[in-house]
Amino acid sequence: MNRKSIKKITALFLILALSVCSGAITGEATADSLVLTDDDGDRIINYKFNYKGATVYALIVLDPSRVYVGTALPEPADWGYGITLDAMAQQYGAVAGINAGGFLDQNGAGNGWPPSGITYGRGINFSTMENGPIAGLDRSNKMWAGYLSYNDCENVGIRDAVSFGPALVVDGVKTDRSLFESGIGARTAIGQREDGAIVMMVVDGRQGYSIGVTYADCADIMVDKFGCINASNMDGGNSSCMYYAGQLVNRSSNQASGTRNLPDAWLVSPLPEGYVKAESVPDQIVISGNALGEIKEYEHACDQETSERMFKFVCEFLQAYYGYFGTKNSDYYYPTMLEYVAPESELKNLMDLALMDRLWVNTWKTTANNIELNGVYSNGDGSYDVIITSDVYEQSNYWNYEAPDTTLRVTLIEAPERSRGYLVTATY
């Protein structure tokens, strides 16, 4: 099989319990923890507090797939100019962001370009550097922090990354502080919580109202305040800046020169198309004659037409593979409603792939009974990785064309009496 010709599409379906998804998102500090709610529904927490005499700004992005690296130039180039964070955010149509990696200050000109070290922006490699300390997100939206080579990045599937450091937290453990002693100053850091949410943090420094923090302080905040399991320091000083809700949030440590031109930034895309708040939703959704369960209350939902299309895809797929949504089983496992869906064009492509015709669905149904031999693997936690490879199809007499390699992760939670829940689809 020619792996270069394989197209991989990944979708994640997750039903979340009421206790996870209630409330609005704002931040209030206690001595040891944060109380979070969501008032505006943008799924981003905008949070500000004081830490040891320093002003700390934080954005918590609940969906890590929305976070990516934007660059001042769209393609790799040896020479050019960086741009300010607000200009970069507007260039990409981003709703939020922070500065990211450093740049090679050629001749001391302060041009903000090219980026230093390994840099990936939406899958494009902007640097020929072989290795270095990085902060990156792979295609499964997991954050990596620490030293990675270019080959490492390719092997683990890094989609977005910048080269800077030091790593502050790796796999839940704060890095040895003796390895990154620092003075007090303006700082930028990025981290990821265990639930996948991305934490972006900027600390003002070298100013009368905010003296700044050390690297060790950043690690403490990331772990003790935000619960990050991986985190990395980003470029600080005059580069430290945050953008949210159409404006710069913090103050540059160099008020005279203003914000610095940057080579890249961690940006946040808008909510996916189709995400809307719903005042009311139908009491039931019936697909193929099977009621998926009574729905009493929602906080967020997409429109009914899109919901029904996505439910049809989910039900057809699961019925073909497992029979979960047959007449006998529909009372035990059911999704309730979509929190958001992928853009309409992507949703249609995903459905077309899964439901190309009845022959494909029937073939899935007959070949997937033996899940170990036909690419359906239980992860042991209620989720399944469904992998259909070109090899499988090429061995079948039914196919006279090459089929794509598809990976689908499905997570089901048994909760027949739940009155509120979510079915979340991740972009792919």
Sequence positions of predicted segments:
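N-terminal low-complexity, Pro/Thr/Ser-rich intrinsically disordered segments
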Residues: T30-K48, V276-R309
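Hydrophobic core
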Residues: L14-S22
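Conserved, well-ordered active-site substructure
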Residues: N107-M129, S178-N233, S239-V281, I285
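Exposed beta-sheet edge and beta->alpha loop/turn motif
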Residues: Y377-Y428
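Active-site-adjacent helix-turn-beta-strand microarchitecture at beta-sheet edges
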Residues: T30-D40, N99-F180
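Core segments of small alpha/beta cavity-forming domains
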Residues: I287-W364
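Bacterial N-terminal signal peptides that target proteins for export
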Residues: N2-F13
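Zymogen propeptides
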Residues: G27-S127
